[in-house]
Amino acid sequence: MKQRSDWPMLEKTENILKKLFRGDHAKMTSIIYRNFRRMTNKEFVYGEIDFLSFHNILENAQPKLGDVFYDLGSGTGKAVFTAALFFDLSKACGIELLPPLYTKANNQLKKATSFFQNLKPDLESKYLEKIPTIQFIQNSFLSYDFHDANIIYIAATCLSDSTWESLINKMAHLNPGTRIIVATKSIQHARFEIIYQGIELMSWGLCPVKIYRLA
């Protein structure tokens, strides 16, 4: 198989993301907080993306210049940073309810600014200009207004049926053409047309992923 012409830059970006999130310990942070708060709701079980696998997933969502990306339940921001660094988005936003994960995500944003400033000049300018497009919101994705989304990612593996149904009903009011990336679960609704399905690598192993487009 012929190697992609952009592979060297993909590899560079992946390495930068790995260095940025080294020592992140997001899963342990989530476990400690949930245990301390005696939170037994399985919806908050923590899982993460694989950087290159998520790049492949996003490519199948057909991102356009200036698109707006949301990660619903964004943890410490891996999917948000991956979307922002690999693609030319106008906004990459993570919505996270748990305070320590939200705090870590914002700390990552500060760390990224400093980290990018120490890269070679050509890479420094490429990645520093992405920083203003990245933001994190502490809120419930069922409450927050993300109507400006063009692409949404949901790790739906542990969501309850009632939460999932509420979220689908909310997303059904989004603009035509909005793409919804879903890990594990499916959407049964007249407005959602499936445009991709495959098995992709996540932190917990191989996972079915579907991408829908709103009619």
Cite the ranges covered by each PLM segment:
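A short SAM/SAH-binding and catalytic strip from SAM-dependent methyltransferases
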Residues: 150-162
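Conserved short alpha-helix immediately C-terminal to the canonical SAM/SAH-binding motif I
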Residues: 79, 100-101
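C-terminal substrate-binding/active-site "lid" region of AdoMet-derived donor-dependent transferases
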Residues: 159-215
